[in-house]
Amino acid sequence: MDKKQSLKTAAYEVFSKKGYKATGISEIARQAGVAVGSFYNYYESKEAIFLDIYIDENNRVRQAMIEELDWEIDMIDLIGQLFAQSRTLVSSNKILAEWYNPAIADELHSYYSSEEGKVANPFHQFLVKTFTNRMQAEGYSPEKIQDILQVYNLFY
């Protein structure tokens, strides 16, 4: 395993146990078996490695949601299930629950609301494609679909 992957693995373990605020770079480096100075060859800050960990964890959890939900049910019911499952999975996951932590929330929200974050987010792309296809199949006009997707983008 290379040093960057060792740092990510260690950071995942430490953040999962202690949370964002109580975790320090020195502890991550020690757990990874690398010098603190080496940490900065791969990440510029604790925020940067946490964002990397958060993105991976979010993608993993959201992929599980894609596989578990029935995407063919009524759209209103589907949206309700989507929100309920998201709440459950986020609140039970120490890393994803940091979304609400003022110490890191701005960084997370900024990334996910950016164009880069949306393009790089497979779950976002899946939802846009899935809901667009469903609305087309149900006879929504292209203008109505666009309006609905604009509202979706306000929330996502």
What do the predicted segments below correspond to?
Residues 1-2:
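N-terminal intrinsically disordered/low-complexity leader segments
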Residues 6, 10, 14-48, 52:
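Helix-turn-helix
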Residues 10, 14, 85, 89, ...:
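Amphipathic alpha-helical interface segments
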Residues 17-21, 93, 138:
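Short coil/turn segments at alpha/beta junctions that flank glycine-rich nucleotide-binding fingerprints
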Residues 52, 56, 66-92:
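Hydrophobic alpha-helical connector segments
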Residues 88-112:
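Amphipathic alpha-helical segments used for helix-helix packing
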